[in-house]
C-alpha cells in the first residue's frame, strides 16, 4: 500500500491523505517494482494525468529512434497518462494492408498483423508488454501521407469507436482511431474537400499541420540570413490557417490547428473563435520557451517544423495562451538520433523531444512568469487535451468522494503525476 499524506488537490486546494493499494501503485523503472510506504507529500500536488494529442513514437519502422515502449515510458516520466500517436509511421498509418518488402513492413507482418493500425492496437499482446500510458491513434488524411489521394474510410472505419469489429463492439478497443491528419504537412488543396467529407462521415476531427513549403529550414528573418540558411516565411502558416478557417465555416467540421507559432496566425484564430467557428488550436513548449535566436546557440538541435519563430512571435504565443486563444498544450514529441540531428541545417530532420520536460518548461515560462496559474496550466495539459481526444475529463476531488477502491484506482490512473510547486 502507498499512502501519500498532506497532498494538495490541484483544483480545490484541499489537503488530503491519498491511499493507493499495492496492486495499483506501479513504479516506472524497468524492474516493474511496486511503490509502497507512508510518505509525507507536503508541497506536492496531485492532478489529472496529462494528455498529449501530438506525439511521434516511430513504431513501426524507425524504432532505432523510439519504440512504443520507450515512448510510453517517456510519457509516463513526464506525468502523461494519455497520448495520441501521429500517422507518420513507416509504413504510414492509413489503414491499408502493408506489402511484404516495403520499409517497416516486416515488423507488422511478423507480428501477425495486416496493417499499422492493427499492429498498434495489438502491440501489448504481440510483444507481451504492459505499457504505462493509454494511447489512441490518428489515421492519415491521404494514402501513405503522400497528399495525392485521400485515404479510404473503408480501410480504417472498423478501427473507430462504435463500429463493429470481428464480432465485438469497437468501444472495447483499447486503442481506437480518434482523429485524421497528414501531420508533417497540411492536407493538399485538391484533397481537402474529400478529406473533410471523410472526417464528417467518421464523426472525427481534422488535425492540421499548417504549412505548405518546398524550401527553407528555419524561420525567415535576420537569423536565417546570418546562418546563410533558406528561410520559411511566417505567412506559410497563416495561408493554411486562413484557408481552413473558411472550410470550417463552410462545412461545420471541427478543425484543430497543430503547433501554431506566429502572431498573425493567432490573430486569425482569435477572430474566428470569436465568430464561434468549430476550430481549436495548440502550441508546444518550445514555441513559448525558445525563438529563432536560440538557433545560434543550439544549431540543428533546435531545428523543427514549424521553425522556431521570432522573439515577437514567442511573446505572441505566450499572450495567446494567457488570453485563451490557445486551447491546449501539446509536445509534438519527435525523437531522432543525435547523428541525424547533427547534420547540417538542410539535411537534419525536424523535431525535438518534449514529453519528459514539458510541464517543467511550461511552468517555468508561464506560471513563474506570472502569465497563468498552475491550475490553468494543468487544465491546458490535462483537461483540455483529454476533452479533445474524446476522454472524459475527470475531477480528482470528485473521485475522492466515491468508494475507496474506485477512488484510489481511478485517481492513480489519471494522476500519478506528483507536481512540485
PLM regions: where:
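N-terminal metal-binding scaffold of metallo-dependent hydrolase/deaminase domains
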Residues: 1-39
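Divalent metal-coordination and catalytic microenvironments
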Residues: 7, 43, 54, 75, ...
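Metal-associated gating/positioning segment near the N- to mid-region
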Residues: 42-130
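Histidine/acidic-residue-rich catalytic or RNA/ligand-binding cores of hydrolases
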Residues: 63, 95-100, 114, 214-226, ...
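A glycine-rich helix N-cap at a beta->alpha junction
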Residues: 126-140
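Histidine/acidic residue-rich metal-binding segments in metalloenzymes
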Residues: 150-329
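His/Asp/Glu-enriched, well-ordered alpha-helical/loop segment
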Residues: 226-254, 301, 328, 334-414
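Conserved small/polar residues in nucleotide/adenosyl-binding loops
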Residues: 419-421
Amino acid at each position: 500500500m502507498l499512502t501519500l499524506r498532506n497532498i494538495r488537490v490541484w483544483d480545490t486546494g484541499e489537503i488530503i491523505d491519498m491511499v493507493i493499494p499495492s496492486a495499483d501503485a506501479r513504479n516506472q523503472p524497468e524492474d516493474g517494482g511496486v511503490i509502497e510506504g507512508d510518505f509525507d507529500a507536503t508541497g506536492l500536488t496531485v492532478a489529472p494525468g496529462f494528455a498529449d494529442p501530438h506525439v511521434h513514437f516511430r513504431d513501426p519502422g524507425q524504432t532505432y529512434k523510439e519504440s512504443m515502449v520507450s515512448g510510453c515510458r517517456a510519457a509516463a516520466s513526464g506525468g502523461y497518462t494519455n497520448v495520441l500517436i501521429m500517422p507518420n509511421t513507416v509504413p504510414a498509418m492509413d489503414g491499408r494492408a502493408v506489402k511484404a518488402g516495403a520499409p517497416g513492413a516486416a515488423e507488422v507482418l511478423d507480428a501477425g498483423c495486416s496493417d499499422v493500425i492493427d499492429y498498434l492496437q495489438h502491440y501489448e499482446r504481440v510483444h507481451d508488454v504492459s505499457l504505462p500510458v493509454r494511447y489512441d491513434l490518428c489515421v492519415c488524411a491521404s494514402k501513405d501521407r503522400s497528399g495525392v489521394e485521400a485515404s479510404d474510410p473503408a480501410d480504417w472505419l472498423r478501427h473507430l469507436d462504435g463500429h463493429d469489429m470481428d464480432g465485438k463492439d469497437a468501444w472495447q478497443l483499447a486503442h481506437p482511431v480518434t482523429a485524421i491528419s497528414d501531420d508533417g504537412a497540411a492536407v493538399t488543396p485538391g484533397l481537402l474537400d474529400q478529406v473533410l467529407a471523410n472526417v464528417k462521415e467518421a464523426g472525427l476531427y481534422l488535425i492540421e499541420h499548417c504549412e505548405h513549403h518546398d524550401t527553407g529550414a528555419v524561420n525567415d528573418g535576420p537569423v536565417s540570413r546570418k546562418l546563410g540558411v533558406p528561410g520559411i516565411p511566417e505567412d506559410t502558416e497563416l495561408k493554411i490557417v486562413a484557408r481552413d478557417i473558411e472550410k470550417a465555416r463552410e462545412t461545420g467540421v471541427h478543425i484543430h490547428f497543430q503547433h501554431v507559432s506566429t502572431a498573425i496566425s493567432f490573430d486569425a484564430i482569435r477572430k474566428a473563435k470569436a465568430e464561434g467557428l468549430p476550430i481549436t488550436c495548440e502550441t508546444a513548449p518550445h514555441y513559448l520557451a525558445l525563438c529563432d535566436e536560440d538557433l545560434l546557440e543550439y544549431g540543428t538541435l533546435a531545428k523543427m517544423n514549424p521553425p522556431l519563430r521570432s522573439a515577437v512571435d514567442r511573446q505572441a504565443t505566450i499572450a495567446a495562451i494567457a488570453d485563451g486563444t490557445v486551447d491546449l498544450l501539446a509536445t509534438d514529441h519527435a525523437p531522432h538520433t543525435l547523428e541525424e540531428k547533427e547534420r547540417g541545417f538542410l539535411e537534419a530532420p525536424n523535431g525535438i523531444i518534449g514529453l519528459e520536460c514539458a510541464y517543467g518548461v511550461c511552468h517555468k515560462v508561464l506560471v513563474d512568469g506570472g502569465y497563468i496559474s498552475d491550475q490553468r496550466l494543468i487544465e491546458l495539459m490535462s483537461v483540455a487535451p483529454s476533452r479533445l481526444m474524446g476522454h472524459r475529463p475527470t475531477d480528482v476531488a470528485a473521485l475522492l468522494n466515491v468508494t475507496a477502491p474506485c477512488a484510489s484506482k481511478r485517481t492513480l490512473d489519471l494522476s500519478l503525476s506528483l507536481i512540485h510547486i
